[in-house]
Amino acid sequence: MAGMKFDDPLTGGDIPVSTEHPVARPGKIVCIGRNYREHAKELGNDVPVEPLFFLKPSTSIIYEGDAIVLPPQSERVEFEGEIGIVIGSRLTKASEEATVDAIRGVIAVNDVTARDLQKKDSQWTRAKGFDSFCPIGNIATEFGDLSQLTVVTRVNGEERQRGSASDMVFSIPMLLSYVSHVMTLEPGDIVATGTPSGVAPISDGDVVEVEIIGLSKVSNPVTG
């Protein structure tokens, strides 16, 4: 079976049998803000004392090769490569230990952000919620030690971000537990665990690639 491919019903393309795509429309996409100290510093923000999180709409999801569309409402759109976690079983008020067994897999996520609108608005829904603002890759169902996951972002082939889960302010199990004490996490939900330093604007004609090294990848052209 290794190396064989099958038709992906969501995109019409081929994907390896060792990977999966998430549901086309997850119930929710939970994103963690400022979970890498250096990223918080580069934006002039304090490191949070407890996890800061927000939601992206499922309509923001796109897949491999789909275009990130720059909206006319923004003059500064930036990439944010992240390690995403796909939930496999229901989590409500879960302990950190219990969250690990509930993970279906890990997934590359680009939390595309209209930075000027994020600074302008009192909350982040508009800045984070445009159609095409959440590219996601394949799900890797075998991923090893969560703390050793590494995310890399490349723009036009040049590395712009690199971050390890070991450098996160809050660990992945802690994040899942924390969120589950606020809202139930259901199968298919995605939790994006924050972006490392190095975020920067993207422009029409760029190609942005986010990879969880050796596990999941998504590459998208930019238009608009």
Residue ranges and their predicted role:
Residues 48, 55, 79, 100-101, ...:
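A short, structural micro-pattern
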Residues 2-24, 39, 45-47, 115-224:
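Catalytic-pocket segment enriched in acidic/His residues
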Residues 75-77, 98, 202:
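A generic structural micro-feature
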